[in-house]
Amino acid sequence: MIQGTTSDAGKSTLVAGLCRLARRTGARVAPFKPQNMALNSAVTANGGEIGRAQALQALAAGIEAHTDLNPVLLKPTGDRGAQVIIHGTARANLDARAYHDYKPTAMRAVLESYGRLRGAYDAVIVEGAGSPAEINLREGDIANMGFAEAVDCPVVLVADIDRGGVFAHLVGTLACLSDSERARVRGFVINRFRGDPALLEPGLRWLEARTGKPVLGVLPYLHGLTLDAEDMLPASARTSAARRDAGVLRIVVPALPRISNHTDFDALRAHPRVDFTYWKRGPVPDADLLILPGSKNVLADLAWLRDAGWDALIKRHLRYGGKVIGICGGMQMLGRTLADPHGVEGAAGATSAGLGLLDYATTLTPEKTLVNAAGRLAFGGDARVAGYEIHMGRTEGPALASPALMLAGRGGERPDGAVSADGQILATYLHGLFDTPHACAALLEWAGLDGAEALDYPALREASLERLADTFAEHLDLDRVFAAFA
């Protein structure tokens, strides 16, 4: 089991790289995260929902993503509550106290999934969540040492040296563990190191002498990886185009407080002719294309957009000929009204005017749509698209008569989304809209980028997984790492 001294220490990436290395040996290996809290999720082939990081790890392992890889997924709906997803299905919205009482039920689901994986694969590489040293979360823990103790799982502890204080993080984490938990830790991995490794040697010797545990590797800081993020927005809010000789498209996406599935924009951030910005505060940069992203709380995020002046900004942008895309929750915001009669996102009966840019209305419903989908753009040369839908809502209205996409359905094609009569606004429920090379190029051309190249994002992601595995093979003591899991 890979545990970390902090969130974002590198657990997900380490598991992905180890899965790819194990796959190279011919072993059948599965990633596993007992409990994940994230707003980036993926749809499995069996119609469930798991954390996006586990879908990436499944890709690294060469297996199909399924709900046993992440049996408990928590999707925050606000500062104190989350939607609880068990074995891929949404069960309830619970606040922190209610979820604490629910943990025994969640743990049973975790152990069921882990047992099935152990029986089906040669090895299971487990990822913890956050830090095992959160004293206030120790009782009833199912994500870190509570799980490791329950199944007698050895642990490797990873820490991020780029943040500073790596030795304090490692020694301090061990100090917060019980005797049996400390004994379970087989060694350390230090992540994101920059500079001369020889200068780190005195610290490594001190750490090993102080703790009696080996350092299993020091991983360098890897720039330019194209891998799906588990949850956090990228540290850099802006990426600049690598090529400017043939023109550049400027894209701005508001960093909504409850933004979900922002992996939708990874292909755009990697495109050599796109200037991409996540807007968080201050003046909004000039843009050719504004994209409203998915949201786990559409009504609250729409109110936030209005408070930030985006309703007027979008209308001004359109008057000057700009383009707008709304994806999932962003699509719902673009319509006339939003209603929450069942209290899916908050108080039952809440309603709000939408931005009023497309003639349809959305009603939030307790039933969640979870489906992988493929089809074509309904304009611009019928470029193929592939992605997934994750939403709790039904949208109806005249604007849907001019769909954005035609997706494969039972007995033929089904329409999705809408394109405005003037061709300036596109709305869709499909996540992953830009991941398919020719669809990405067609959409960038629609937004104003002449001669847009087709960027093969899946190939970039695959190359990053290979680079990750090569780096781990060079910088980890793999014999000791895999011996720790024996």
Curated annotation (Swiss-Prot):
Pfam families (UniProt xref): CbiA, GATase_3
Active-site residues (renumbered): 328, 431
GO term, biological process aspect, one: cobalamin biosynthetic process
Protein origin, superkingdom: Bacteria
UniProt keyword annotations, A-Z: Cobalamin biosynthesis, Glutamine amidotransferase
Organism in which the protein naturally occurs: Burkholderia mallei (strain ATCC 23344)
Source taxonomy: Bacteria, Pseudomonadati, Pseudomonadota, Betaproteobacteria, Burkholderiales
Family: Belongs to the CobB/CobQ family. CobQ subfamily.
Protein name, UniProt field: Cobyric acid synthase
One example GO MF annotation: ABC-type vitamin B12 transporter activity
Domain GATase cobBQ-type, residue spans: 248-439
Entries under SUPFAM superfamilies matching the protein: Class I glutamine amidotransferase-like, P-loop containing nucleoside triphosphate hydrolases
Gene expressing this chain: cobQ
Role this protein plays: Catalyzes amidations at positions B, D, E, and G on adenosylcobyrinic A,C-diamide. NH(2) groups are provided by glutamine, and one molecule of ATP is hydrogenolyzed for each amidation.
Pathway: Cofactor biosynthesis; adenosylcobalamin biosynthesis
